[in-house]
Amino acid sequence: MTIIWSIIIVYMLAMVGIGFYAKTKIKDSADYHLAGRRLGPIMLAGTLAATEIGGGSSVGVASKAYGEWGLSAGWYVVSAGIAIILVSFVAPFMRRAMATTVPEVIGRRYGKSSQLIASILSIVASSALTAVQITATASIVHVLTGFDLKLAIIISGAIVVFYTFLGGMWSVTLTDFVQFFIIVIGFAIAVPFALSNAGGMEHVISQIPKEQLGFTKIGWGTILGFIVLYFMTFSTGQEAVQRYYAAKDEKTAIWGSIMCGGLMTLYAFIPAVLGLIALAAFPNIEENSALATVSVELLPPVIAGILLSGVISATLSSASGNLLAVASVYIKDVHTNIFKKELEDQAELKASRLIVVITGVGAIGISLFSQQIIPLLVFAFTIRSTGPFAAYLLGLLVERVTKNAGLASIIVGTVVGITWEILENPFGIMAVIMGSSASLITFLVVNQIELRRGVDIAPTAYPKE
């Protein structure tokens, strides 16, 4: 255990060190929020992959494989990989907008009311997503140290708040780049060791109920739902879109997205396999502890240290991206809307750091209240995506749209999505499908009615040349 902890502590100190280094690169708020719009395709792919391969795609997938989904839990990540490849078709339009936030673009086209609603949805969802990643990190710390889970949550939250506070998007991007390679290496080398120490593949398979080995146990409807869910959240979620805004050009946005999708698909089933190994070797543990238990009990200390550093890096990366998303949206959209004036650049930088701290404290509170990982992830994705989805994407892609079409679609989509989620997805239809469908239909109907009545076309989403 000492070796495992030594590796993890060295990793943590390295991340804090990168935060201090990134702080020296921060000259203004554009550097803090967008890394100066200088990300190349490899850096973009790395930061996207590390951000999206978070607690849900590591600890969450392993726990679902241990539990009700079995091997098919890997489709949760494959779906995300497919979705982010699809986002490559709209990525250049995002970059062309030269914006900082999703609500900023919505505000340009549909007005301040739409911008404020989208901002609130984004802040609530990103805060919840930060809490999910803190919970995933804390579950590892809890198993390794024996600390009370609530204490582990507080420690994990404090670390991610600290290095995001220091370096903003530069620290997030640099740590993401390092973290992605740790994730891949850690998981790739863990499987053969875990299999061998659990008694070999034949023994592991013999200990697992046959239905847990079903490749598509979760069902094609759920898989399709996840693809739609992730396409929506990657194309409207601030922590993902902010990275496209930070790309150095439109071509970079396309190739970074495609490369990220490929990397995620290659990684997808590794956590699921480790979850099944945990089921075979430790059939009576808590689901969320599956990955950490395999690491501690079945892997050599050095390999366990690398794997758990990879898991912690994945969750911290996602958490930092969401913290920064909240700061960006509040400063660029909420503050400007409420107080009717923009902050001076250095004042904006200070305010952004303050918001990171406040959001981090709030996320720790959410994490202390609820330790569910994937259910909270899906609910957060539903909140932030179902309403703004049609308004944001059609606002980028279609010239002839009206302000009221955007506002109506945001309200209707959000209400339908949240209501459907509260009703626990009647008829097996995911809330994100119902909400986004309602949003799209509302947008198209209102837009057609208003265009026929001669209502003015909304201003463009793009800055003037």
PLM features: what roles do these ranges have?
Residues M1-E465:
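Membrane-embedded helix-loop-helix hairpins and adjacent transmembrane boundary segments
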